[in-house]
Swiss-Prot record:
It comes from Ictidomys tridecemlineatus (Thirteen-lined ground squirrel). Residues 450-515 form the AGC-kinase C-terminal domain. Belongs to the protein kinase superfamily. AGC Ser/Thr protein kinase family. GPRK subfamily. PANTHER family: G PROTEIN-COUPLED RECEPTOR KINASE/RIBOSOMAL PROTEIN S6 KINASE, RHODOPSIN KINASE GRK7. This is Rhodopsin kinase GRK7.
Amino acid sequence: MDMGGLDNLIANTAYLQARKTDSDSRELQRRRRSLALPGPQGCAELRQSLSPHFHSLCEQQPIGRRLFRDFLATVPKYSQAVAFLEDVQNWELAEEGPAKTSTLQQLAATCARDPGPQSFLSQDLATKCRAASTDEERKTLVEQAKAETMSFLQEQPFQDFLASPFYDRFLQWKLFEMQPVSDKYFTEFRVLGKGGFGEVCAVQVRNTGKMYACKKLDKKRLKKKGGEKMALLEKEILEKVNSPFIVSLAYAFESKTHLCLVMSLMNGGDLKFHIYNVGTRGLAMSRVIFYTAQMTCGVLHLHGLGIVYRDLKPENVLLDDLGNCRLSDLGLAVEVQDDKPITQRAGTNGYMAPEILMDKASYSYPVDWFAMGCSIYEMVAGRTPFKDFKEKVSKEDLKERTMKDEVAFHHENFTEETKDICRLFLAKKPEQRLGSREKADDPRKHPFFQTVNFPRLEAGLVEPPFVPDPSVVYAKDVDEIDDFSEVRGVEFDDKDKQFFQRFSTGAVPVAWQEEIIETGLFEELNDPNRPSGDGKGDSSKSGVCLLL
């Protein structure tokens, strides 16, 4: 009997079954019935320690945003402001056409009304709206009205929210969020892959059913290879990033043997797999454009935070269940300090820009756009620009080609727009590269993206051209993933233990709150008719101890 094949079948079956788990499963229901929010009396200290900022509390944090909206709905003047903002957002995200133009005119008419004592808009704005004669003028004024409304909400409505029971409830959720996290918080499933310091496996949060990928970094291996600084940098960068186009960090914790990063689980496999292992080599142009648009948004989000990715390639671009893609593996990402160039060589051969390959490397953000050009080329042609499929090339020869050869387009699927964007991204000199030619050089304006509505894409309203098969595990068989040998002769001192504690910060607020809302736990624990905990003990006690 093929025991390896049997092990793989068992691992895949358990993993696929876990992915199908929903809130109706008996075990999950039993666990959730035992949960309770911490009592309000435990929030006094937290209230004093927090300095609430409108943007963080009411816009970035999903539970804060939800409770702020619930509060605003209780005050007529405030709810009118919210309704206006929703109308503006619907207009912004609408497809171009007569309906969008009509909505703009209706919004401008709303702004033109005389503001009464209950209005959140100014008299000056109303006067300008009445005088507006073109849609371009109306567009500018509606954007101004949006800004005025946001400013209004940040003043008295925000202060009223902080004094309301809705903010008290937010503090209870923050206490719940701050509970300790350990490996007991999760159920672990099959190994999905491995890296230099450990393996990646699928895990499931026991109390919500949410599936994640857990990157387990072997503590001894980290110390032996001197990888602590790199691991902490990746963790801190992931914490800063909140983008639908980059994998999210949800938890950081330690077990006895590992440091663990719990991140978005991308079930659809990586783009390299789809380029080379599904059908004919390469991808359909509709997919190339869609993925490139999402990858471009991800790179722009990183650059906006002062981060250079340095490892953009199809292998690091992962698909989710719906077919949307995200950038992953930020292990080589680096923050730019005071606009100073980076001098350390890092990246993957075949995707590194010429300025990285020079004897004295000195580079910055443009290297990511060069890698974007390599990735577009590979998605279309099923090979990289400077190395043919399965061609054996030395590192030195590949370096020489990258620095000197002009890119050639022999594959029949290259359109003129695709050739042009590849040439611009693959420019040898960074100052001539698309995305870097001037401060406001925006790759999204290139004709290659003429069919992409970027505001709708960022809002998740564009349907992906390909949806992964939910019954397929897009990962190597478990017996093909090599086990790590045990690291011997490594002992930990107090400095190591301090580092492990610094790394293990628990739940990441935005991702954790999204999980709580997405899995229905927010509604369950907020239900005033819900029995307290499991019906045993004092319901006012903290629910933290019940969660683990």
